UniProtKB/Swiss-Prot annotation:
<dbReference type="GO" id="GO:1902387">
    <property type="term" value="F:ceramide 1-phosphate binding"/>
</dbReference>
<dbReference type="GO" id="GO:0005794">
    <property type="term" value="C:Golgi apparatus"/>
</dbReference>
<keyword id="KW-0813">Transport</keyword>
<feature type="binding site">
    <location>
        <position position="111"/>
    </location>
    <ligand>
        <name>an N-acylsphingoid base 1-phosphate</name>
    </ligand>
</feature>
<keyword id="KW-0333">Golgi apparatus</keyword>
<dbReference type="GO" id="GO:0005829">
    <property type="term" value="C:cytosol"/>
</dbReference>
<comment type="function">
    <text>Mediates the intracellular transfer of ceramide-1-phosphate (C1P) between organelle membranes and the cell membrane. Required for normal structure of the Golgi stacks. Can bind phosphoceramides with a variety of aliphatic chains, but has a preference for lipids with saturated C16:0 or monounsaturated C18:1 aliphatic chains, and is inefficient with phosphoceramides containing lignoceryl (C24:0). Plays a role in the regulation of the cellular levels of ceramide-1-phosphate, and thereby contributes to the regulation of phospholipase PLA2G4A activity and the release of arachidonic acid.</text>
</comment>
<dbReference type="Pfam" id="PF08718">
    <property type="entry name" value="GLTP"/>
</dbReference>
<dbReference type="InterPro" id="IPR036497">
    <property type="entry name" value="GLTP_sf"/>
</dbReference>
<dbReference type="GO" id="GO:0010008">
    <property type="term" value="C:endosome membrane"/>
</dbReference>
<dbReference type="GO" id="GO:0005640">
    <property type="term" value="C:nuclear outer membrane"/>
</dbReference>
<dbReference type="GO" id="GO:0032691">
    <property type="term" value="P:negative regulation of interleukin-1 beta production"/>
</dbReference>
<feature type="binding site">
    <location>
        <position position="107"/>
    </location>
    <ligand>
        <name>an N-acylsphingoid base 1-phosphate</name>
    </ligand>
</feature>
<dbReference type="GO" id="GO:1902389">
    <property type="term" value="P:ceramide 1-phosphate transport"/>
</dbReference>
<keyword id="KW-0445">Lipid transport</keyword>
<feature type="binding site">
    <location>
        <position position="57"/>
    </location>
    <ligand>
        <name>an N-acylsphingoid base 1-phosphate</name>
    </ligand>
</feature>
<keyword id="KW-1003">Cell membrane</keyword>
C-alpha cells in the first residue's frame, strides 16, 4: 500500500503542516509540505472518486517535487524560499509561457497551493457548519471561491455535479478517524490555523516574486 493509499489520519496532517513552518514561520520545509499533501490525498481518496480530478493531479505534483528533492540539486529544494531563489536565479521559471520548463518546482507548488486553498476553505466550512448542513453546498462554495477560478468551464461543471454525491457531514467526520464529532471539530480547530499559515506564507512568497499567475 502506497503512502497515498493508507488510512487517512487528520492528526498526521496536523503534524505535517505544523512541522512545515520553520524560522519563526518565515519558511516552509518542502518535504513536510508534501507529507501534509499526502494526507490530504488520502482524505480525498477515502471518499471514492468524487475528488479524483484534484487528487490525481496532486499525486503527480507530489512526485515531481519528490524527484527534485532526490535529485542532484535536492538541497536547493529543501525549503520554499531556497527553491524559489534557485529556480529564479537559474532561469528555470518562464513567467510568460509554459513550454520551456513545464514542471518547474515553482509551477508545481503553485498548483498544489491553489488546491490547498479549496481544501482549507472546505474543511473550515465543515468545522463551523451544523449537522444538517449540505456538504455539497459547502464544497461548491469553497470551490467557487478558489480552484474554480483556474479551471475551464467543463471541469467546473463536472466538479459541481460530482459534489452533489458527497456524503453527510457525519460521514466526513468518520473518515477523519479522530473520534466523536466534538473531537473532530476540536482537531480541525487546531489544524486549520497551521494550514492557513502555510497557505498565507506561500502566497506571500509567490506574490513577492510575481509567481501567482505562472502559466
Amino acid at each position: 500500500m502506497s503512502s497515498t493509499e493508507e488510512k487517512f489520519s487528520l492528526k498526521e496532517v496536523l503534524v505535517s503542516f505544523k512541522s512545515c513552518l520553520v524560522d519563526d514561520d518565515q519558511d516552509i520545509i518542502v518535504e513536510q509540505y508534501l507529507n501534509g499533501w499526502k494526507g490530504l490525498v488520502r482524505f480525498m481518496n477515502s471518499l471514492g472518486t468524487i475528488f479524483s480530478f484534484v487528487s490525481k493531479d496532486a499525486v503527480t505534483k507530489i512526485q515531481i517535487m519528490e524527484n527534485y528533492l532526490a535529485g542532484t540539486n535536492g538541497e536547493r529544494y529543501r525549503t520554499l524560499q531556497s527553491m524559489v531563489e534557485h529556480e529564479l536565479s537559474s532561469d528555470l521559471v518562464d513567467l510568460t509561457k509554459r513550454c520551456n520548463n513545464p514542471d518547474s518546482g515553482c509551477r508545481t507548488i503553485l498548483r498544489l497551493h491553489r488546491a490547498l486553498r479549496w481544501l482549507q476553505l472546505f474543511l473550515e466550512k465543515l468545522r463551523t457548519s451544523n449537522e444538517d448542513s449540505k456538504t455539497s453546498t459547502l464544497c461548491t462554495e469553497a470551490y467557487n471561491d478558489s480552484l474554480a477560478n483556474f479551471h475551464p468551464w467543463i471541469i467546473r461543471k463536472t466538479a459541481t455535479v460530482a459534489f452533489l454525491a458527497l456524503p453527510t457531514r457525519n460521514t466526513f467526520f468518520e473518515v477523519m478517524n479522530v473520534g466523536t464529532t466534538e473531537e473532530v471539530v476540536a482537531m480541525l480547530g487546531e489544524s486549520m490555523p497551521y494550514v492557513t499559515k502555510v497557505y498565507d506564507f506561500t502566497h506571500e512568497i509567490y506574490s513577492q516574486h510575481n509567481l501567482l499567475e505562472l502559466p
